[in-house]
């Protein structure tokens, strides 16, 4: 199927299908895009991000969103919210274009999460503990160009964090953090209302629109890893 293809973002290749660390389920590439900032009139790319969805996501999302254009999906906060909170696994591959320390990355992500939780009144001791575990997981890490942060987001609320120095996806599930709010918020920080990668959001909207409109049985149509 044409929509389920691999993508290249600033020289980083994202495979069309993978099995995430610590998972037995096949995920397809929902979309990918760059994260960057306009600095001095020039766009500087920091990371390339690929978002993968478990194949079971398509029937769930199609029930509400089939028939919508990519443009309509791209402009819908509810669509991306349904991806972040839906009852299926998600996998996020954040690959470095420029070098970054683990502390730099974790501070920025958790700062945004905590601000959001406090604003909606759900910041409790459980979230504070999860944030601390998240920071500790990243503290000793350093990410040169080409290295990756690998997040598996389970519907039960477990966030699995693994690291790769060469961009490969290992089978080691890495660090586990049991907190549903954090599991969802890490993905929302990328594709949510104030997500850091508008390019990834556009990519997901375009590709999922095509997949939902053309695929009847996703298990039959999507390629499956042996």
Swiss-Prot record:
Gene3D superfamilies: 1.10.890.20, 3.50.70.10. One of its GO terms (biological process) is flavonoid biosynthetic process. Keywords: Flavonoid biosynthesis, Isomerase. It holds the Pfam family Chalcone. Its EC number is 5.5.1.6. SUPFAM superfamilies: Chalcone isomerase. InterPro entries: CFI, Chalcone_isomerase, Chalcone_isomerase_3-sand, Chalcone_isomerase_bundle_sf, Chalcone_isomerase_sf. Part of the biosynthetic pathway for all classes of flavonoids, a large class of secondary plant metabolites, many of which are brightly colored. Belongs to the chalcone isomerase family. This is Chalcone--flavanone isomerase. The gene is CHI.
């Amino acid at each position: 199927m044409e929509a389920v293809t691999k993508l290249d973002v600033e020289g980083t290749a994202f495979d069309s299908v993978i099995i995430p660390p610590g998972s037995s389920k096949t995920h397809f590439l929902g979309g990918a895009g760059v994260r960057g900032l306009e600095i001095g009139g020039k766009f500087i790319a920091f990371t390339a991000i690929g978002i993968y969805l478990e194949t079971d996501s398509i029937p769930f999302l199609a029930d509400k969103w089939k028939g919508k254009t990519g443009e309509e999906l791209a402009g819908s906060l509810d669509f991306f919210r349904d991806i972040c909170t839906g009852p299926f696994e998600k996998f996020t591959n954040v690959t470095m274009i420029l070098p970054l320390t683990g502390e730099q990355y974790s501070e920025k992500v958790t700062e945004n999460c905590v601000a959001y939780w406090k604003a909606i009144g759900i910041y409790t001791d459980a979230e504070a503990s999860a944030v601390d575990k998240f920071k500790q997981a990243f503290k000793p890490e350093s990410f040169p160009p080409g290295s990756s942060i690998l997040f598996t987001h389970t519907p039960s609320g477990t966030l699995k964090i693994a690291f790769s120095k060469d961009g490969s996806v290992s089978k080691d599930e890495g660090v586990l953090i049991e907190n549903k709010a954090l599991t969802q918020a890490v993905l929302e920080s990328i594709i949510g209302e104030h997500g850091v990668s508008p390019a990834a959001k556009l990519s997901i909207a375009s590709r999922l629109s095509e997949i939902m409109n053309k695929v009847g049985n996703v298990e039959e149509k999507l390629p499956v890893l042996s």
